[in-house]
Amino acid sequence: MSRYTGPKWKLSRRLGISLSGTGKELARRPYAPGQHGNDRRGKISEYGMQLSEKQKLRLMYGLTERQFRNLFARAGKIREGKHGVNLMILLEQRLDNIVYRLGLASTRAQARQLVNHGHVTVDGKRVDIPSYEVKPGQEISIREKSKNLVIIKDAIEGTVGRPSFVEFDADNLKGSLVRLPERSELEPEIDEALIVEFYNR
């Protein structure tokens, strides 16, 4: 399955969650798209709830179904912790997500582009793989020739706070994942137990 490239705002409203992370999609119309969007939702089946939760998390991080399923399988092999929480932590460790969390991009999609186009380095070496798994302590920075990109400057200026599991040096446009996040620091709108149930049915 290919990555979803359709209208993100309508999809965000349908799923009831901001896929961009900005919250703008739901600010004016916090209901599903359509003439009577806020009156159309009937009772959702258990399977429907599980599927919806899986789609929310997958699309929030911009993964294809295959990528998401593979990551779910990896999370299941981690001996410590809960399966669903481990999945969310692995998603947070993706390089494109760390670039987003550091405030070097306004959205995860924009962060993925920065990585794809070779603007990001890990421990001084260019890495152009968005799914690269960042380990605590690794230094993430912007290449010297890319530091004047307008989209990066705009993203930094528009960033209001950063999660406590990352550190950022605004003067040198670099930062790091200082530790793995706790569940309480991750998306509160997601019920990861439903995702585990979806794949284990």
UniProtKB/Swiss-Prot annotation:
Disulfide bonds: none annotated. Signal peptide: none annotated. Keywords: Ribonucleoprotein, Ribosomal protein, RNA-binding, rRNA-binding. Residues 93-153 form the S4 RNA-binding domain. One of its GO terms (cellular component) is small ribosomal subunit. Gene3D superfamilies: Ribosomal Protein S4 Delta 41, Chain A, domain 1 (1.10.1050.10), RNA-binding S4 domain (3.10.290.10). Part of the 30S ribosomal subunit. Contacts protein S5. The interaction surface between S4 and S5 is involved in control of translational fidelity. This is Small ribosomal subunit protein uS4. It comes from Latilactobacillus sakei subsp. sakei (strain 23K) (Lactobacillus sakei subsp. sakei).
